[in-house]
């Protein structure tokens, strides 16, 4: 989701006119990502944030784009300096940590937009939190080991991972690129 979302935000003006579009990711682009990621083979084995920033600087040279290659959890204070924080990682532990920081620093912390896919891309969701009088991410999933209060999918939806024997990545989530692009579009609209 993140690569498509970064592109759409840039095309919408994020990082222009004195603004900055910072991208953070601790993962590298792998072969199993190519079917559902903005970036292609020339960016394999590169940090996703750095590669995406380089790609966007080529496509949209007027933007100010920065990259953080590594876990944002090592430098969460950088989030406090943003106008909007967007978590499109799909990493629930990171989402909970960002939410906890945001709630603890209300009302001065920027709004946080959480975006993700459920059920092998069957549903996309986007939720923005920031107002102290309204729900936070944990309000939607009070039992962190359980199911969310408001499910996007029916309870009998089966989640599967498959073996991707064609490349070095042992597991992949089988959903098409259109799902990541749709989730990014939803998040861009909410942002």
Predicted regions and their residues:
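Conserved SAM/SAH-binding loop
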Residues: 69-75
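Glycine-rich phosphate-binding loop and adjoining beta1-alpha1-beta2 segment
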Residues: 20-61
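Phosphate/oxyanion-binding active-site loops and adjacent basic polyanion-contact surfaces
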Residues: 1-3, 41-49, 180-184
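Glycine-rich adenosine-cofactor-binding loop
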Residues: 1-30
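Short amphipathic alpha-helical segments
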Residues: 6-10, 35-36, 97-100, 126
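A short, aliphatic-rich alpha-helical micro-motif
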Residues: 78-80
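Hydrophobic/aromatic anchor residues within beta-strands of the central parallel beta-sheet
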Residues: 65-67, 112
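E1/E1-like adenylate-forming module used to activate ubiquitin-like modifiers
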Residues: 83-191
């Amino acid at each position: 989701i993140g690569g498509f979302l970064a592109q759409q935000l840039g095309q919408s003006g994020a990082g222009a006119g004195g603004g900055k579009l910072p991208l953070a990711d601790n993962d590298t682009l792998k072969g199993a990502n190519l079917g559902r990621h903005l970036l292609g083979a020339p960016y394999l084995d590169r940090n996703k944030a750095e590669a995406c920033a380089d790609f966007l600087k080529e496509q949209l040279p007027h933007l100010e784009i920065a990259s953080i290659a590594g876990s944002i959890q090592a430098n969460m204070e950088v989030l406090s300096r943003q106008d909007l924080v967007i978590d499109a990682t799909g990493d629930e532990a990171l989402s909970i940590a960002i939410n906890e920081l945001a709630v603890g620093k209300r009302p001065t912390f920027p709004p946080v937009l959480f975006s993700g896919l459920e059920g092998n891309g069957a549903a996309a969701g986007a939720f923005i939190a920031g107002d102290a009088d309204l729900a936070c991410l944990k309000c939607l999933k009070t039992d962190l080991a359980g199911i969310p209060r408001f499910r996007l999918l029916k309870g009998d939806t089966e989640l599967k991972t498959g073996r991707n024997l064609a490349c070095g990545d042992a597991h992949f989530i089988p959903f098409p690129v259109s799902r990541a692009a749709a989730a990014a579009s939803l998040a861009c609209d909410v942002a």
